[in-house]
UniProtKB/Swiss-Prot annotation:
Superkingdom, natural source: Viruses
Membrane-related topology note: Peripheral membrane protein
Family in the record: Belongs to the herpesviridae glycoprotein L family.
Biological processes, Gene Ontology terms: fusion of virus membrane with host plasma membrane; symbiont entry into host cell
Gene: gL
The name this protein goes by in its record: Envelope glycoprotein L
Record's keyword terms, sorted: Fusion of virus membrane with host cell membrane, Fusion of virus membrane with host membrane, Glycoprotein, Host cell membrane, Host Golgi apparatus, Host membrane, Membrane, Signal, Viral envelope protein, Viral penetration into host cytoplasm, Virion, Virus entry into host cell
Assembly description: Interacts with glycoprotein H (gH); this interaction is necessary for the correct processing and cell surface expression of gH. The heterodimer gH/gL seems to interact with gB trimers during fusion.
Organism: Equine herpesvirus 2 (strain 86/87)
Annotated function: The heterodimer glycoprotein H-glycoprotein L is required for the fusion of viral and plasma membranes leading to virus entry into the host cell. Acts as a functional inhibitor of gH and maintains gH in an inhibited form. Upon binding to host integrins, gL dissociates from gH leading to activation of the viral fusion glycoproteins gB and gH.
Signal peptide, first to last residue: 1-24
Amino acid sequence: MRSLDRYAIFILLACGLLWRPCLSSVPMPCCPIDSKKDVSGLPSVFEVKEIFFNYPQTCNYTNVAQFTYVPQGANVSTVVCANGFNLMSFILAVLQRVFEKPHNMGLLAENINKIRTDYALNFTAVNSESSRFNVVPVGRNGKVVTTTRVVKRSARSGSGAPPG
């Protein structure tokens, strides 16, 4: 199997083989994109575990997406807010390079194209700005809710609880 085919299948698996779970499956789907984030600090594509896209109506036609990754050798996952247009275009470019696509992969590409077109047709200066989602979520106990969580126990940490 060609490495690009394996890469595309990885993306398909990252979306759980079904389109529906990839859409709006996160508690806070509308998030601010950190445009000042150093690109070199982004994870390897092979560290990405989940990719989440939103329906256009979810965030009032602001195209934000999220992906979850676990750095190699770490035991916590982190959620990153991303430009939905960029992430959709990247995945579509990878899917277009796969020669023998499974049926689900073709459906995934078709649905991403439909959603991306819907966003593009409703694109305005107002909905191109994600900073309005810059809200700090507070839990019932009054503490700030974070997006980092333990995904497996570490032999060194003992309890498996996050530090702090």
